[in-house]
Every structure is written in C-alpha cells, then in structure tokens.
C-alpha cells in the first residue's frame, strides 16, 4: 500500500467500497515493512499473526461509516503494553516481557477496528532524543540514513515517514513525539496531560508522560485522538473532561485568530535557517487573516535543568520495580539477594537509563531534595505561569519544534548535555501539561523542519484547526524520502 499518497479517510473509503479488504491491506503492509525496514530499522517486532487474525475479523464484520480506523494497520511504540506481543521498552531488562493485558489505548483501538502490525523501536525506557539508546538497534532517519530519527519515538516516526505504516502511536515526556515528527517531516501530536490514559504505558516520568500520535496528515491525527482520548478509571490522572470531535474545526479559516511567537524560541541556539522557516510560517498565518505577535516566555531558559531533575527523579522511583526478582532480566551466577539487585540492574539497564536513575536518586536524597527537586518544581510553576499569562491574550503559540534539523548518528551520543539541549523548545510544554503538535514547515539542507503549535489546556481542536490550515497552504508532504 502506497501510504505516501493515502489518508485514513481514503483508506476508509476503499475498505468501505470493497476496493480493498483489510486482509489485503495487512498483507501489503507487512510485505512493505519487510522490504523497507532493512534500511530504516523502525520495528522491533511484527505482530503478523495477530494482525492477520484481526483483519479477517474486520472483513467478516464489515465496516461502518463511523469507524474510520476499522481495518487500518498502525504501529505501536514499544513502551505501550500489548497483550501477547513482546513489549520491551527497547531495554534488555524487558527483552522477553510478554504482557498479559492491553493498555487502555490498545483496547480502544481494538474496539475501533484498528490493527496493530508491530512494535516500534525507541530510546530505552523513552530516555533519549535520538533512538540511539535502544538496547537492540539504531533506527535511521527516513530522509537520510546517516542521521538520527529523533527520540524517543524515533521508530514510530521513521515508520510513518518511510511509508511503512499510515499512522503510529508514541509517547511524549519532553518532546518524544514532536521532535521525531519534526526530524522526519510528519505530524506529531502530544495531547494535554490527562487527555489520554497512561494505563499500560511503561512509566518513565509519571507527571510528564503522555501518549500521542504520529501521522502524515493532520486530520489523521485528529481521527486517532478521537479514538484514544477520554477518562479512564484505571488512571487517576486522566481528566474527566468531555472529548470533542477533534476533526470538527478542520477546514475552518483562522481569520482573526491571535497567535503568539515567543522571542526565546528564535534566539540563541536556534539555527537561523530553521528560524527563517518559522518566520515564513508566521507570515503565512498573517496572510490567512491571523495576527502574529512577538511575546516573551522568560523562564524558558530554565526548562531543561528543571525537566531533567523532575523526570530523572520520577524515573528513579518508577524503575525501582525492575529488580531482577519479580520479572525482567536477572543476572546469572549471583551470590545473594543484594547481588541480584546490583548485577541485574547494572547489566539490564543501559548507560543513559543508569545515568538518569543516579541523577534522580541524588536529587531526591535528604541532603539535596530542597536544593534540586523542590526548586525544579518551583521553576515548573513559573514556566506554567508564563504560558498562562500569554494565553490570557492569545489563542495559540508557535515556534520551531527543534533548534536544528536532524543531526548525524553518533554526533551527540557521547555528550549528554548537548543531547539534552535539543529538547529546549519541547520540554516547556510537558512541564506545563499543555497540548502541542509539530507539523512540516519546509526543509533546510534537504532535511525537514518542524513548526510547533502550542494550545491551551484541552484545546487540541484549535491546534488541529490551525495545523490543517497551514497544511492546506503547503505541499511538503508531496516531497517524499528517497524521491519515491
């Protein structure tokens, strides 16, 4: 199936009309993955038998008008648990973990008739910005196989961008959906914190993690979010807030909309060529009848240190459960219980995960809690207030998703601080719990640039409205990796 030229709506129409069956679609998708993934390395495991079984069931039941995802093959990031399909979080610690239940988002997708064709590669336990931290393989950027696909949802982004699947799920803790989407020239959406259930998401940082979507088209993302959003009694952090039809405002003009462009998002560290693409996008919005005004988010500069203290502290707590006793990797030839703990965790976790566990444990220790973790929480509040002040007068905030285009594989992996700074523009959104998306905004040196759109809490609909208006004005999706 040529996913480069297809939307979920078009697939739905073909399935409804009988031009193609779900079984045929799954067979073509699996064949395409087997052909393309030798170069991209986006997948860790295929769910071939399960996908074929589900496709046959969908074909037998038929597809209703109100089931746009029925029979549609999608990919799932490997930190979302899938019953009967090995789920590793790209870690040696979980190399043979076969879940006995489905995450809430998987249950919702299954009920909607969507088909999981496989699990995608990622940075181990979602800790990374390049997918180089996977214990199993290094995924390549769909546009240039010498460059990173971003992270931590790099496998999902590369799979969609390379045309292996039409859509995928990812998770976003500090930019892990939006940054790979920007690097691969696709649409990545991080919903409001609490909009989508985290039940069944292998935890990294519980106050920051959020499941979201990676697609080629804005409306496809809205349709996916329509299915996976909503309150879940098994996740106390999900909001009991009505879920609108996220496609409802797509196609509406943006005349009169007030858009903010923070000066900090185009400042030091941002490639001038990337900044120029964002300024060009701002001009397009003005031509469409919106106003774009420079504003300030003054505490942006403190976002990265605040985030890495909070996220690492929560990770050190969450990952205590991987102890070599209950499940997961266990070291061999251990001498005693302490040896089980120490060696299983030392051998089972990769370098970046161990680095963050150590940082988090230090930040939570009695002598340093106030100086680090408590202060990081206070900075988080200041960053949230910055956004609240801007949203008193504006409908949306825009800026670049990343400071640069995708960098070379191996270029930053040995320099954690440089790697962490790549998330400077996405992290503030997670700290504030806001919804945001990255959409294609052109190219620099042949590599995609992402435009980030940040909305008010639970106002994903406005993001989709503006993103779709921008998408309609541009033909970036017509440009395909490898000239296919």
From Swiss-Prot:
Endpoints of the signal sequence: none
Pfam families documented for this protein: Amidase
PANTHER family on file: GLUTAMYL-TRNA(GLN) AMIDOTRANSFERASE SUBUNIT A, TRANSAMIDASE
Catalytic center residues: 77 (charge relay system), 152 (charge relay system), 176 (acyl-ester intermediate)
Gene Ontology terms: biological process: translation
Organism classification: Bacteria, Bacillati, Bacillota, Bacilli, Lactobacillales
Keywords assigned: ATP-binding, Ligase, Nucleotide-binding, Protein biosynthesis
Name used for this protein in its record: Glutamyl-tRNA(Gln) amidotransferase subunit A
Record carries keyword Protein biosynthesis: yes
InterPro entries linked: Amidase, Amidase_CS, Amidase_dom, AS_sf, GatA
UniProt keyword Amino-acid biosynthesis present: no
Family designation: Belongs to the amidase family. GatA subfamily.
Annotated EC: 6.3.5.7
Subunit structure: Heterotrimer of A, B and C subunits.
């Amino acid at each position: 199936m040529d996913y480069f030229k297809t939307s979920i709506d078009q697939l739905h129409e073909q399935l409804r009309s009988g031009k193609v069956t779900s079984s045929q679609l799954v067979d073509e998708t699996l064949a395409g993955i087997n052909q393309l993934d030798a170069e991209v390395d986006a997948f860790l495991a295929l769910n071939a038998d399960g996908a074929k079984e589900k496709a046959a069931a969908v074909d037998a039941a038929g597809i209703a008008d109100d089931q746009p995802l029925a029979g549609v093959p999608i990919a799932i990031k490997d930190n979302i648990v899938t019953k009967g399909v090995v789920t590793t979080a790209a870690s040696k610690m979980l190399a043979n973990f076969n879940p006995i239940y489905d995450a809430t988002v998987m249950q919702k997708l299954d009920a909607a008739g969507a088909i999981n064709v496989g699990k995608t590669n990622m940075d181990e336990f979602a800790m990374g910005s390049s997918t180089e931290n996977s214990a199993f393989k290094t995924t390549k950027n769909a546009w240039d196989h010498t460059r990173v696909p971003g992270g931590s949802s790099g496998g999902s982004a590369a799979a969609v961008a390379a045309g292996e699947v039409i859509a995928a799920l990812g998770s976003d803790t500090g930019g892990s959906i939006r940054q790979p989407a920007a690097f691969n020239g696709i649409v990545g959406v991080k919903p409001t914190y609490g909009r989508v259930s985290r039940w069944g998401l292998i935890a990294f940082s519980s106050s920051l993690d959020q499941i979201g979507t990676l697609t080629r088209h804005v409306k496809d993302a809205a349709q996916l979010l329509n299915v996976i959003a909503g309150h879940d009694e098994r996740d106390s952090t999900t909001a009991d807030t009505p879920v609108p039809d996220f496609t409802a405002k797509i196609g509406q003009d943006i005349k009169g909309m007030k858009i903010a462009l923070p000066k900090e998002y185009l400042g030091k560290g941002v490639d001038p060529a990337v900044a120029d693409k964002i300024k060009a996008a701002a001009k397009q919005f003005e031509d469409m009848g919106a106003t774009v005004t420079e504003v300030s988010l003054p505490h942006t500069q403190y976002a990265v240190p605040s985030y890495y203290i909070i996220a690492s502290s929560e990770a050190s707590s969450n990952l205590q459960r991987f102890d070599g006793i209950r499940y997961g990797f266990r070291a061999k030839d251990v001498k005693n219980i302490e040896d089980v703990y120490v060696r299983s965790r030392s051998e089972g976790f990769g370098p970046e995960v161990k680095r963050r566990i150590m940082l988090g444990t230090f930040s939570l220790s009695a002598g340093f809690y106030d100086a680090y973790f408590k202060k990081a929480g206070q900075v988080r509040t200041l960053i949230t207030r910055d956004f609240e002040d801007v949203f008193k007068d504006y409908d949306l905030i825009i800026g670049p998703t990343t400071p640069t285009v995708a960098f070379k594989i191996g270029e930053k992996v040995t320099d954690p601080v440089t790697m962490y700074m790549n998330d400077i523009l996405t992290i503030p959104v997670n700290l504030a719990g806001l919804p945001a998306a990255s959409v294609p905004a052109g190219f620099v040196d042949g590599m995609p640039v992402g435009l980030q759109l940040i909305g008010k809490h639970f106002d994903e609909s406005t993001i989709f409205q503006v993103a779709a208006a921008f998408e309609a004005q541009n033909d970036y999706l017509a440009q395909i990796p490898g000239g296919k």
